Design a protein with these regions (language model features):
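Short, small-residue-biased leader/transition segments that mark boundaries at the very start
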Residues: 1-6
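Residues at the starts of beta-strands that form the adenosine-phosphate
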Residues: 13-15, 88-89, 159
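Short internal beta-strands
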Residues: 16-20, 93
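Acidic helix N-cap motif at the loop->helix transition within catalytic regions
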Residues: 23-30
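Conserved beta-loop-beta/alpha segment of the NTase-like Rossmann-fold superfamily
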Residues: 45-105, 122
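Short, flexible, basic/aromatic active-site loop/helix in glycosyltransferases
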Residues: 101-127
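Conserved alpha/beta core of the MobA/IspD/sugar-nucleotide pyrophosphorylase nucleotidyltransferase superfamily
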Residues: 118-191
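Conserved donor nucleotide-binding strand/loop of the catalytic core
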Residues: 32-45
Length: 191
């Protein structure tokens, strides 16, 4: 997100963009040059984040954000950052709108969790750097592949605080997502 890379976020000292080697030139053309470096991704999300973490000598907080969520707002970033400063681990999320069902291997419903206790976790996810490194080391020792950074912290026994975000901080992963993203951008421009 351009907000994460923005120079009007003085709390962010450095931005590491994790991408494929073939995408560096295209990404470089889109992003501001100051504060931004590129790191090659791995085979999994966890490996990609590990590649980035390995390039960092030391920092207070590690902010992890999905490039597929370009509509994150400055307020969401700052609110999550402030919560992580207080608690050591925080993530942005929204309450689920749909009723969620648990199914078995035969696609039969086996349970209905209480929707009021379900959050769809988004990014940014922000953690104390020392805690995150411990969580990565533990996961590596266990041989687990975690698709979510909050789960790494849960595995370490560290509670993660949730900051209620915006539904507009959507993940753009399919062609059907693009018209919605365009509508959000147009609405923001009109404000």
């Amino acid at each position: 997100s351009s907000d994460v890379c923005s120079s009007d976020l003085p709390q962010v000292d450095e931005v590491l963009v994790v991408c494929r080697p073939a995408d560096v030139d295209a990404m470089s053309a889109l992003l501001p040059q100051e504060k931004v470096s590129f790191v090659f991704g791995g085979k999994t999300r966890q490996e990609s984040v590990q590649n980035a973490v390995d390039t960092i000598d030391d920092c207070d907080l590690l902010l992890i954000h999905d490039g597929a969520r370009p509509l994150v707002t400055r307020d969401e970033i700052l609110d999550t950052l402030h919560r992580a400063e207080e608690t050591g681990a925080a993530a942005t999320g929204v309450f689920v709108k749909d009723t969620i069902k648990v199914i078995n291997d035969d696609y039969e419903i086996t349970d209905t969790p209480d929707r009021s206790q379900l959050i769809a976790i988004q990014t940014p996810q922000i953690f104390r750097f020392d805690l995150y490194k411990q969580a990565m080391e533990k996961a590596k020792a266990q041989g687990g592949n975690f698709t979510d950074d909050c789960k790494l912290m849960e595995n370490l026994g560290v509670p993660v605080s949730v900051v209620i975000g915006e539904y507009t901080n959507m993940k753009i992963t399919t062609p059907e997502d693009l018209p919605m993203a365009e509508a959000i951008l147009k609405a923001r421009e009109a404000e």
